[in-house]
Regions:
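HIT superfamily nucleotide-processing domains
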Residues: 2-197
């Protein structure tokens, strides 16, 4: 079914919204780039650019709080807590789901930098990752926060243990291979498949 946006009045409502209006009413061509969560993909699914990679490569200006061979750190444009720092690997890793066992030293470095930059009591520190589809940018980034949160909404957004937010320790455990192995051991079909091999 094709929805006639003209007839529903949506076009008139969006007329003053500039880029959003143009984007919503444009025709998708097979050769169009797709922009999603700070990353531009071409029609073949190849990454063309990434906001956080641009910061790491200094092709887009961003005031960095820290930089070394592995990571950069900076303040987000909309902080959620008293202190809020993003620690980002220079190597493009899309999300926590793309981490592998060999990434655990990188995760440890991200934590080390986060703790060093926060300089606050551990009881007020939260280190967490948002889980897709709730992540804001498709480039792995650790949220290092010193509570209190700036609003109740931010407290909810960064509630560890919810489907959208995982603790640093939980993600590291999973990336180390221990989490995947534990899940595999608890799935009867996986046990049966291993026994048949």
């Amino acid at each position: 079914m094709h929805l006639n946006l003209q007839a529903t009045g949506v076009i008139g409502t969006l007329a003053g919204m500039g880029k959003l209006s143009k984007w919503l009413t444009r025709k998708q061509r097979p050769d169009d780039d797709i922009v999603s969560k700070g990353v531009v993909w071409n029609a073949r699914g190849e990454m063309q650019s990434c906001l956080f990679c641009d910061f790491a490569n200094h092709t887009k200006e961003k005031e960095l709080l820290y930089e070394d061979d592995l990571v950069i750190a900076f303040s987000p444009s909309k902080p959620a807590a008293k202190q809020h720092i993003l620690v980002v690997p220079k190597r493009h890793i899309s999300t926590v789901g793309d981490l592998v066992e060999t990434d655990t030293p990188l995760l440890d470095r991200m934590k080390e930098v986060a703790v060093k930059l926060l300089k606050c009591d551990a009881s007020q520190t939260q280190l967490s990752f948002h889980i897709p589809p709730w992540n804001s940018v498709d480039h792995l980034h650790l949220h290092a926060l010193e509570t209190p949160y700036l609003s109740w909404w931010n407290g909810l957004r960064f509630s560890e243990g919810k489907p959208w937010c995982a603790s640093f320790e939980g993600v590291r455990y999973w990336a180390s291979g221990a989490g995947a192995q534990e899940e595999k051991e608890n799935v009867p079909e996986a046990k049966d498949a291993e026994e048949k091999c």
